[in-house]
Amino acid sequence: MGQEQSQTANGTSPSGYRVLIVEDNPHIIEMYSYVLKKLAANELKGTTPLEVHFAADGHAAMTLLTDSPFHLVMTDLYMPVMDGFQLIEKIRSEPALKSLPVVAISAGGQDAKDRAMKLGVTSYLKKPVRFADVMDTVKQLLRIT
């Protein structure tokens, strides 16, 4: 698997929601892909595209974020090259990205959650995450009713 991947969850053109998932574990990437495809099919019903991009680390994520706009970032906190904490700091320091919703996702303990919250994440999910929690968080932050 390469550093960056892209797919449109409902097969339509990329003119709707754009979500960036930053994760280095291929199995977890598959789970997010499945959940977001379900969200596109069940909640958006093909009316609004949900374009999902994947990056394996914070550096690849920043490249994508500076190349084009996104509506939501969901990031693991522990990854090689540039971890999620560093990514959150970079996002919050960029004027154009400062208000971008960021969800931190980690199996780390309370210290990881506290650190992520202090850095300015919008939301935090603890691994292992439940499908419903991912879907509810994405719906809430993208304001999907």
Where are the language model's segments positioned?
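Conserved acidic carboxylate
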Residues: 23
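Active-site residues of response regulator receiver
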Residues: 76
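Receiver (REC) domain active-site loop signature in two-component systems and cognate sites
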Residues: 79
